UniProtKB/Swiss-Prot annotation:
Keyword Transferase tagged: no
UniProt name for this protein: Arginine ADP-riboxanase CopC
Annotated control of activity: Interaction with host calmodulin (CALM1, CALM2 and/or CALM3) is required to mediate arginine ADP-riboxanation of host caspases.
Gene name of this polypeptide: copC
Organism of this sequence: Chromobacterium violaceum (strain ATCC 12472 / DSM 30191 / JCM 1249 / CCUG 213 / NBRC 12614 / NCIMB 9131 / NCTC 9757 / MK)
Impact when changing R159A: Abolished interaction with host calmodulin. Abolished interaction with host calmodulin
Keywords: ANK repeat, Host cytoplasm, Lyase, Repeat, Secreted, Toxin, Virulence
Effect recorded for L59A: Abolished interaction with host calmodulin
């Protein structure tokens, strides 16, 4: 994925209709906005700095409205709970008002359940609300250039046709439609961004070898929202599922209690969401609610003693009782970040994420390059294949058999569902694959043209015919379908 490194720009800005009187009208007409850190303004130009700050704040708010509009108007959950917005092409600031209303309602719900807090609980709430948080995005992709980190949402990447894959699935999009946000785990310790994160997993998942850490004071965070769990699968992993087994093992009763769904209302998947203003109070009050319900006296004593004094202890508590997830609208672009390698990256991960700098460091022999090419074939990664073709000399014999871990022969892999036509064309052009060679294992006797027809891949079928594929070799199931596919 390439890194965007430019100042905010508008590819299209339609002015509000004359006499509309709607201050949010311009926000609804914004489209094609890209954001990056504003250019540096010298200390002597205070007026310019103030103006630039106001423009940047407005653009962030306008973009955030589109992200929330997409979520609230299209997520089936919000329709079920009566919180949906009307679908439209562009969204005004009412989308942000919807977030604020939900946040207030969810905060009021836990406040009502708790009633008055005692002095120890008030102290704990104050401790959490005054603490400095950091947000952690884990990935295998190359998301920075050493000076600027630019992390885009799934929606933005797809719109610009530069996605290298991700962790947003059809179920997330259908239920929540929150794929125009960048997702982060939360570090509660108060340590600086330059300190290595204390947590390397989120809801039991390892999302990448590198962590990009930003402070909660970042302007891009101000229109974000927080959930106490993974927003889609809003269950806290408990006991043996928890990341920090040494900590959870010290409080077995607490470990048994943490594995739970956190939701408001009758729908189990209705994870409460909180805006930036309310998020710290929400975490504090939900922790107090958990403590009141807990039967683990030792854990409660630890919270009101050790966690009040130690940032690391507080982080262990909050990342065991919750798995908080923070969401920044559309794009997080900043120079105020730190990158932390958490573990060595695997070759497969570098290919899957199209991280060419990391791939170059991992491929030190022709054998490595061949394995990387098989991964590129398997995942349809054109950029990786082009990189390898430009840096290594291959022969047909290099691909005669698949490396360990790959289960399809070359011809089948090159024409499998989702395979890259570019990579197929490169292999056929170089004579590394025989266009009419029958499969020997899966669907024995069929050819690559059968796969192209079976999967309805017109572009692949045309490429195969260009390279001499014999339609007479098509199986009886596919023989009559080729002309219709090519029509």
């Amino acid at each position: 994925m390439r890194v965007e490194n430019h100042s905010p720009s508008l590819s299209k800005l339609n002015p509000p209709e004359a006499g509309s009187g709607d201050p949010t009208a311009i926000g609804r007409r914004l489209s094609g906005i890209r954001r990056a850190p504003l250019p540096h303004v010298s200390a002597g130009s205070d007026g310019e700095a103030a103006a630039a700050g106001k423009i940047g704040a407005f653009l962030r708010k306008a973009v955030a409205a589109q992200s929330y509009g997409l979520m609230f108007a299209n997520g089936k959950l919000f329709e079920a709970t009566g919180d949906a917005l009307e679908k439209r092409g562009q969204y005004g600031f009412s989308a942000l008002q919807r977030l604020d209303g939900l946040s207030r309602r969810n905060l009021a719900a836990v406040e009502a359940r708790l009633g008055a807090l005692d002095s120890a609980e008030r102290g704990l709430k104050e401790r959490i609300m005054t603490g400095a948080w950091h947000f952690r995005h884990q990935s295998n992709a190359a998301l920075d250039d050493g000076k600027t980190a630019a992390i885009a949402s799934n929606h933005l990447l797809a719109r610009e046709s530069r996605s290298s894959g991700g962790n947003t699935f059809a179920g997330d999009k259908a239920l929540l439609s929150n794929h125009d946000f960048v997702f982060f785990g939360v570090e509660f310790s108060g340590r600086g961004k330059q300190d290595k994160p204390l947590n390397h997993k989120h809801s039991t998942m390892d999302f990448g070898a590198n962590a990009y850490v930003v402070p909660d004071t970042l302007p891009a965070c101000r229109h974000g929202y927080l959930t106490l769990t993974d927003h889609f699968f809003n269950r806290v992993p408990g006991g043996r599922e928890a990341e920090h087994q040494d900590f959870v093992g010290s409080f077995p009763q607490m470990g048994a209690e943490t594995g739970r769904w956190i939701h408001e209302g009758k729908y189990r998947q209705n994870a409460p969401i909180f805006n930036y203003r309310d998020m710290k109070a929400a975490v504090a009050l939900h922790l107090i609610e958990f403590l009141r319900d807990s039967k683990d006296a030792a854990f409660k004593a630890y919270v009101f003693d050790q966690a009040m004094q130690s940032g690391q202890a507080l982080d262990r508590v909050l990342n065991s009782v919750f798995q908080a997830e923070f969401h920044i609208p559309r794009l997080m672009a900043t120079t105020d970040y730190a990158k932390h390698p958490l573990r060595p990256m695997l070759l497969k991960e570098a290919v899957d994420s199209v991280n060419l700098p990391a791939l170059s460091g991992l491929v030190s022999s022709k054998g490595d390059a061949v394995t990387a090419m098989w991964h590129a074939i398997d995942k349809g990664k054109d950029a990786v294949a082009a990189h390898l073709l430009g840096n290594w000399r291959f022969e047909a014999g290099d691909f005669a058999s698949a490396p360990p871990g790959f289960y399809h022969e070359l011809n089948y892999a090159l024409s499998e569902h989702g395979a890259s036509v570019y990579i197929l064309d490169q292999f056929l052009s170089r004579g590394w694959a025989a266009v009419n060679a029958p499969f020997e294992h899966v669907n024995s006797g069929e050819t690559m043209l059968d796969n192209a027809v079976k999967y309805g891949n017109r572009e692949m079928a045309a490429a195969l015919i260009k390279h001499g594929a014999d339609r007479n070799l098509l199986s009886e199931w596919n023989g009559g379908k080729l002309d219709a596919l090519l029509a």
